[in-house]
From Swiss-Prot:
InterPro entries: CRAL-TRIO_dom (IPR001251), CRAL-TRIO_dom_sf (IPR036865), Macro_dom (IPR002589), Macro_dom-like (IPR043472), Macro_GDAP2 (IPR035793)
Keyword annotations: Phosphoprotein
Transmembrane segments: none
Family membership noted in the UniProt record: Belongs to the GDAP2 family.
Protein species of origin: Macaca fascicularis (Crab-eating macaque)
Protein known as: Ganglioside-induced differentiation-associated protein 2
Length: 461
């Protein structure tokens, strides 16, 4: 019987050393089929592991990552290893740790390790090299995270050990002591190591797959509903769950009938005032989050900024399409940044100038995001938006805009003006009132010739 309680016929202790091992070598030089990269949701995190992988893998890795369109916390995604010794790189995103959300962080970190191993199994990989997924700047306590990492790997190998021959944990000098202390607990090489490790055994060792268990969230379901349970007391004792927790938490309390409320909305029976109040509450939640969130990474893109005023004295806001790497950023954070910047602008009349100039498929905002933005923002955004100047459109963008404004947000249709050249734009907004990205001026000069200080008014605007 080893410290995790696995019967000897289920786990061969003599085989365990080949399953788990730790090393202080660079992860990139690990002789494994795949190595693990810990990153953020846009897969652009700058940490020692990621930077080393990007440097050695070469520029092709960045191109491959753009196709993934990010990675959510707890997920795992696969790319080639390119110039690395490993054939593959498995990318995952560890959770940010806050003590009051400890359970959620534990579950997310478990998912990281579990999904990496599951992906390795599906791709028939014989070995995996793990970095420490819980990066220091995300604040996860090292020892707690190490328990989850080793336990999850151990439980996975108990079930699927025949498919994965070796797992390597590549650790730094700071992490090595913790891993050396806890590795014998989950991968004991002798009975002596087993006994020496017992004091480090945590109270919660998870379920059969290593997943963290929250007792009060366990719900018992009878094997044979409707059938009399003769051994009710015996089974309750064996279950080991305190049923007194059930019903005592917020998620178990009675709430209003949400489906009924939605049905009333669909039937038009909910008053206009109630709908507006509900929408305002939702917008205020987004606004509060926008004011408290760190959005510096989105701001640094310089994709949205205020410039001068148009010929009618209305504020001009500029959106630079080429500066929006849709596949590499968290689009919810982009929405938060839009609200953060625009909330005080939208209290009075304004216009938007969108530069579609030299955008690629990686810069195009999809209709679902635009519809979400339109639905979330306050009514003042729509009421005070007087025009959207769509500069340097393509045929495809014109068709997409027509479909979107016809079938999704018809209220915008009459406000959209396609502007093929800056000559046309200057009939509505003076050149001195707009801060142009240099590439926009260069493109327009190349396509439409240099501009001058006076222009005939365009009938389109």
């Amino acid at each position: 019987m080893d410290p995790l309680g696995a019967p000897s016929q289920f786990v061969d202790v003599d085989a365990l050393p080949s399953w788990g091992d730790s090393c202080r070598d660079e992860l990139n030089s690990s002789d494994t089929t795949a190595i693990v990269n810990t990153s953020n949701e846009s897969l652009t995190d700058k940490n020692p592991v990621s930077e080393s992988i990007f440097m050695l893998a070469g520029p092709d890795l960045k191109e491959d990552l753009q196709k993934l369109k990010g990675c959510r916390t707890g997920e795992a995604k696969l790319t080639k290893g390119f110039n690395l010794a490993a054939r593959f790189i498995i990318h995952t995103v560890g959770p940010k740790y806050k003590s009051r959300y400890r359970t959620a962080a534990e579950s997310s970190l478990y998912s990281c390790y579990r999904n990496v191993l599951q992906l390795a199994k599906e791709q028939s990989m014989s070995s995996v090299g793990f970095c420490v997924i819980n990066s220091a700047k995300r604040g996860y306590p090292l020892e707690d995270a190490t328990h989850i990492a080793l336990r999850t790997v151990r439980r996975f190998l108990e079930i699927h050990g025949e498919t994965i021959e070796k797992v390597v944990f590549a650790v730094s000098d700071l992490e090595e002591a913790t891993y050396q202390k806890l590795l014998p607990l989950y991968f004991p090489r002798s009975l002596k190591e087993e006994n020496r490790s017992l004091p480090y055994l945590p109270a919660d060792i998870g379920n059969a797959e290593g997943e963290p268990v929250v007792p009060e969230r366990q719900i018992r379901i009878s094997e044979k509903p409707g059938a009399p349970e003769d051994n009710q007391e015996e089974e309750d004792e064996g279950l080991g769950v305190d049923l007194s927790f059930i019903g005592s938490h917020a998620f178990a309390r009675m709430e209003g009938d949400i489906d009924k409320q939605r049905k009333l909305i669909l039937q038009g029976q909910l008053s206009e005032a109630a709908l507006q109040k509900q929408h305002q509450r939702n917008y205020n939640r987004w606004l509060c989050q926008a004011r408290s969130e760190d959005l510096s990474d989105i701001a640094s893109l310089k994709a949205l900024y205020q410039t001068g005023v148009d010929n009618c004295g209305r504020t001009v806001m500029v959106v630079v399409g080429r500066n929006i790497p849709v596949t590499l950023i968290d689009m919810d954070k982009a929405l938060l940044y839009f609200i953060h910047v625009m909330d005080h602008i939208a209290v009075k009349e304004y216009v938007l100038v969108y530069f579609h100039t030299l955008t690629s498929e990686y810069n195009h905002l999809d209709s679902d995001f635009l519809k979400k933005l339109y639905d979330v923002v306050d009514v003042k955004y729509k009421r005070n938006l007087k025009a959207v100047y769509f500069v340097h459109p393509t045929f495809r963008s014109k068709v997409s805009t027509w479909f979107f404004t016809t079938f999704s947000v018809s209220g915008l249709k009459d406000k959209i003006h396609h502007v093929d050249s800056l000559h046309q734009l200057f009939s509505a907004i003076s050149p001195e009132q707009i801060d142009f990205p240099p590439f926009v001026l260069e493109y327009d000069a190349r396509e439409n010739g240099p501009y001058y200080t006076s222009y005939p008014p365009s009938p389109d605007l």
